[in-house]
C-alpha cells in the first residue's frame, strides 16, 4: 500500500490508511486514559531526560504512573493525536484548531523540543498502538498509516514553532 502524492508533491492520506486508523482508534478509544499514560511512560523509558521538559514532573515525588497531572496530560495528548489522525483524510489536513496548533508550536518551541524528541514520541506512539491492538490487527500497513498521520501532525506543529517576530 503506497501513500499517494498530490500534484504539489504533498502526501495524501488515502482511504485505506484512513480505514486502518479509524478501525484501530475505535478499539483503543475506550481505553484512552490508560493508553495515553502507557504512551508517555514509554517516551520516558526511551528518553528519561524528557521528564525534565514537563514542569509538573520536575519537583514531583509522585511516581510517574500515579501522577494525576501526567495522567491528564497524557490522555489529552493521546486523544488529540488519535482524533487528528482519524480526521486526516476527511479534512485533507490536520484538523487541530489553529489556535491549538499555535499554542502547541509555541509550547514546543519554549521547551526546546527538537526533531529527536518528535522521533522518540513517534516511536513510542507506534509501540503503544501496536501493544494496544489485537495481534491480528497490527500490520505493516497499520504502522505506516499511523506513522503518516503522526508525521503530518508533527509537520503542522513544526510550522507553528517559530519565535515571535
UniProtKB/Swiss-Prot annotation:
Its EC number is 1.7.2.-. InterPro entries: Globin, Globin-like_sf, Globin/Proto, Leghaemoglobin-like, Leghaemoglobin_Fe_BS. GO terms for cellular component: cytoplasm; nucleus. Signal peptide: none annotated. SUPFAM superfamilies: Globin-like. It catalyses: Fe(III)-heme b-[protein] + nitric oxide + H2O = Fe(II)-heme b-[protein] + nitrite + 2 H(+). Its cofactor is heme b. It is found in: Cytoplasm; Nucleus. GO terms for molecular function: heme binding; metal ion binding; oxidoreductase activity; oxygen binding. Residues 12-162 form the Globin domain. Keywords: Cytoplasm, Heme, Iron, Metal-binding, Nucleus, Oxidoreductase. The record marks 143 as: Homodimerization. A motif (Homodimerization) lies at residues 45-49, 115-127. Heme b binds at residues 55, 69, 73, 103, 107-108. In embryonic organs and at low levels in vegetative organs. Binds 1 heme group per subunit. Pfam families: Globin. Its main location: cytoplasm. PROSITE patterns: GLOBIN, PLANT_GLOBIN. Belongs to the plant globin family. Phytoglobin that reduces nitrite to nitric oxide (NO) under anoxic conditions (e.g. during flooding or in waterlogged soil). May not function as an oxygen storage or transport protein. Has an unusually high affinity for O(2) through an hexacoordinate heme iron because of a very low dissociation constant. Homodimer. This is Anaerobic nitrite reductase GLB1. The lineage of its organism: Eukaryota, Viridiplantae, Streptophyta, Embryophyta, Tracheophyta. The gene is HB.
